[in-house]
Amino acid sequence: MKNKQEWFHEKTEKVSPEIMIEVQLSADIIARIDLLLKEKNMTQRELAQKLGKNESIVSRWTTGFPNFTLRTLSQLSVALGEPLIQIADH
């Protein structure tokens, strides 16, 4: 029987590098949202209200791997008062 690491490695070695990067970026953004919510002592409900969105949408963002649009990232940055992502200088 395979352990979890072997199973995970077997599944991920078949995934394209582009998808792996996409999943990692989504996970990083979700982690940043969670961190900012905690730092600002803000709930998902409060964030949803600031965005004018349903709380279930915010919940789905933080529990899955959403394909965030630039507009959504911008709206989240404004609502949280800090940038979610930064582009490295050349």
Show where each model-derived region lies:
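N-terminal flexible/basic segments that precede or flank functional cores
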Residues: M1-L35, E39-K40
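Short basic helix-loop element that most often maps to the first helix and adjoining turn
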Residues: A31-K50, Q75
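DNA major-groove recognition helix of helix-turn-helix/homeodomain DNA-binding modules
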Residues: R71-Q86
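Helix-turn-helix DNA-binding elements, focusing on the entry/boundary residues of the two helices
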Residues: Q44, E55, L70-L73
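Short, charged recognition helix plus adjacent turn
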Residues: A88-H90
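Recognition helix of helix-turn-helix/homeodomain-like DNA-binding domains
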Residues: L51-N67
